[in-house]
Every structure is written in structure tokens, then in C-alpha cells.
Amino acid sequence: MWVEKGFYMSDQIYVALLDEGINVWRPVPALRLESNTYVVLRPDDYDPSVETWQFPPGTLVVCEQKQLADGIFPVAIRQTEDVRRTA
């Protein structure tokens, strides 16, 4: 799924919301750097006082395809520091 953001196209990934009491996944825009490595982007409605993201905007993450309620989607599973170590 593609989301237009500024002058480039970004992918949509899912990030876990913390402190919700149940598993909640937030769709967020992300810039793909490699096949499974993304930088989480800041959507216009981002408000850290309302939602606590496991990986906030600016975080470099590794994603895996996971089954969620509505299908299989790329889900951020861990933070990484180096794009070369994520393959």
C-alpha cells in the first residue's frame, strides 16, 4: 500500500501502540531503505501525548510480514542502527 507524503512515495507499515491494554497496531508512513528496512515517518496527526508508539517517527526499523486482523502486513519488529545488518 502506498501513501503520498511530500515529494516522494512512502510505504505503509504497522507499529505497535504501547499502554493500550490490548494489541493495537497503528498504520504509519515509512520510507523503505532496503527490502525489509524502513524509516518511520511522522504523519500529520502524530501526537505522542495521545499514542505511545513502540517505534516513534525517525526510528530505523526492520519489518516482517505478520498476520493482523485484516490481513498480512509489514510490521515493525525491531529497531536497527545499520541498514547493512538487517538482511
Predicted regions and their residues:
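Mixed-charge, low-complexity intrinsically disordered regions
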Residues: 2-87
